[in-house]
Amino acid sequence: MIRLSILDQSLIGEGETAADTLQHTVKLAQMAEECGYHRFWVAEHHNNDEIAGSAPEVLLGYLAASTRKIRLASGGVMLQHYSSYKVAEQFHLLSALAPGRIDLGVGKAPGGFQLSTDALQAEYKKPVRQFDEKLEELTHFVRDDFPDTHRYAALRPRPQVDRKPGIFLLGGSTESAISAAKLGISFVFAYFINGEEEVLKEARRAFDAHLPPGSEAEFHLAPAVFAAHTKEEAEKHIVSRESIKVVLKDGRKVNVGSREQAEAYLENVTEPYDIIVQKTGIIAGTKEEVAEELTRLSGTYKINDFVIFTPIKNAVEKQLSYQLLSDAVLAAKR
């Protein structure tokens, strides 16, 4: 059975303030709960005039108080900027406030360009620790299972909770899928960034191949979805069918979105780089057409959980898209 969740970045609409947008996010979470969506994800972006969602760990607390039962998740915390212990404590606290409803999604990206990254990491020693090392440490903190000889074996995130947050890694590559699988944590493939089905196919295979025996970790897919009463109405929301990735000489990879955003990012880059153009995973059409494509992806890649990303700034049109999708896929569950 297909299960749907929502990823909301809190995109600021025409003529809106950031405060207006955040209230739209709250209302969208409430609608998602009523329509039968399983989980509501909120994102982290920095120094972006078009996005209000900069602190998911704060927004989740407000959403937990504004809803009753829907699961809530960060999509995701940009772990490279933070102490893994502090992140674990934040999500343990959220889990104490909303038991069984909180999940911790983390991302490898910076969530912004170099200026915001420099500000967020100003107190860090250089070079910053490798992401995989921090992710493994975070996983041990949340699970409370450091080896006895580890320097943090006696350190526990407070408050202690009976129902710990689930951990997810968000990414768009086979490499990230393998990193998640080896740790036995769930993986969300960012299809809305990398819509190459060959990459999806290989990431799915690699995730299964590297998962420890008995692990309950899952592989989720996050497509961009636009549903409307007609295919033409849905497709008017598509700004581009490609995304740009910048690969720096030191191995860092930054998804920058559009060509215009790539140009802005590269203004502050002094080292050699390569640019990779990726097809985005966009599904647009009537509710029946969208449901048909989700069913195809589910059957082809054995995926039951979809994280639906609908980057429409107009709150009414965005909500309509999610309502139509729920009518086509989730109505029988309500």
From Swiss-Prot:
GO molecular function, one term: monooxygenase activity
Gene3D superfamilies given in the database record: Luciferase-like domain
UniProt cross-references to CDD domains, sorted A to Z: Flavin_utilizing_monoxygenases
UniProt pathway annotation: Amino-acid metabolism
Keyword Flavoprotein assigned: yes
Keywords associated with the record: Flavoprotein, FMN, Monooxygenase, Oxidoreductase
EC number: 1.14.14.-
Similarity field: To bacterial alkanal monooxygenase alpha and beta chains.
Protein name, entry field: N-acetyl-S-alkylcysteine monooxygenase
Gene from which this protein is expressed: cmoO
